[in-house]
Amino acid sequence: SRIGEPSLTSPIQGTITFIIYRRHGAVVSDTPFFSQLSEGIDSACRRLRYHLNICYLYENEDTEKRIDEIVAAGCSGILLLGTEMSEKEFAPFSRLEVPLVLLDCYFENIPVDCVLINNVQGAYLATEYLIRTRRSQPGYLRSSYSIQNFEERADGFYKAIRAAGMCASRSV
């Protein structure tokens, strides 16, 4: 084992709760991305000798009650997958005293640790690649679900279209 890392015989350090928030469940589902994310979290928790609880929280539930139950169960920290979450839906989590990291979501007005994908840059680079290799204007298929990630990807796409001197209105 490496210096500073607990060995496999070390006692459990605590419990991390991975909360998957689902507003409609259409975005956060059983896809390879979310499966790999869960597996990576599980692997890191085991390596660091933390027990992992996975909990689904739905929009129509009593969020504050569920949070209280999670904390009362002895939670050492929370990883919150907020892909489908709005700033208003995050509000009950802001009062927590246990460490919390927000995954795949960011709220400009709330001071919370986050782990994000750079959606704007990713969409920009992908669009730039398509323009360079296809030498034609790509189209953009947009989801009917409004989440921050999708808005950021659209922003990156349209920035690349404009940077290439193309008409954004033709990219329907």
Q: What do these predicted regions represent?
A:
Residues 57-61, 81-86:
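Short beta->alpha connector loops
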Residues 8-11, 69-70, 93, 130-133:
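Structural motif
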Residues 66, 88-97:
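Catalytic-core regions built around general acid/base machinery
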Residues 27, 85-87, 109:
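Glycine-rich nucleotide phosphate-binding loop and flanking beta-alpha elements
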Residues 18-23, 36-52, 77, 94-102, ...:
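Bacterial carbohydrate/catabolite-sensing allosteric modules
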Residues 1, 85, 102-105:
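Helix-enriched interaction subdomains in cytosolic or periplasmic regions
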Residues 31, 64, 90, 150-154:
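Conserved strand-to-helix beginnings and helix N-cap segments that scaffold or border functional pockets
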Residues 2-67, 74-76, 158:
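Amphipathic helical "hinge" segments at domain boundaries
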